[in-house]
């Protein structure tokens, strides 16, 4: 595999890497607090029914699609991260760097979360298989739970986390800052 000509640290500057690390810290620490303070599938109203903290576990892909596919999801996420790093490195002029940083922070947060078995009300341990099903859980911790307008197809938006928020913010930034005509030329 041929490495890009641009030096790595001219694209992934120390300040950008620190931002990704900070986003990763916010994501994993928020998940830790939720997993140690709540029980599985517990829901705590924060702003009435509009916003609740609801502990759920996503063993699938985006928005909980293809549940109970933890290992394929782990490999797919790892592959996506490697792809994003090399794509960003090769195309450093495409999009706003902060958009990429948000996406990377979120991708790393959910990727690392998949390496742990969660024990609600207690903590977590490294591993991929719960020893006590129903008490221990695998998958990404989701806990931000918002009501969705009734005229749409479902009552509540799927629960999400800080990492998911980072990815969404990053994608919006990239959509508004990428030069789509320039991408067509490459």
From Swiss-Prot:
Compartmental location: Cell inner membrane
Keyword Nucleotidyltransferase: no
Residues forming the catalytic site: 142, 164
Database matches in InterPro entries: Peptidase_A8
Pathway in which this enzyme or protein is active: Protein modification; lipoprotein biosynthesis (signal peptide cleavage)
Example GO BP: proteolysis
Top EC class for this record: hydrolase
Keywords carried by this UniProt record: Aspartyl protease, Cell inner membrane, Cell membrane, Hydrolase, Membrane, Protease, Transmembrane, Transmembrane helix
E.C. number: 3.4.23.36
Catalytic activity entry: Release of signal peptides from bacterial membrane prolipoproteins. Hydrolyzes -Xaa-Yaa-Zaa-|-(S,diacylglyceryl)Cys-, in which Xaa is hydrophobic (preferably Leu), and Yaa (Ala or Ser) and Zaa (Gly or Ala) have small, neutral side chains
Main location: membrane
Pfam families the UniProt entry points to: Peptidase_A8
GO molecular function: aspartic-type endopeptidase activity
Bilayer disposition of the protein: Multi-pass membrane protein
GO cellular component: plasma membrane
Transmembrane segments: 8-28, 44-64, 66-86, 97-117, 157-177
Family the entry assigns: Belongs to the peptidase A8 family.
Function as written in the Swiss-Prot or TrEMBL entry: This protein specifically catalyzes the removal of signal peptides from prolipoproteins.
Name used for this protein in its record: Lipoprotein signal peptidase
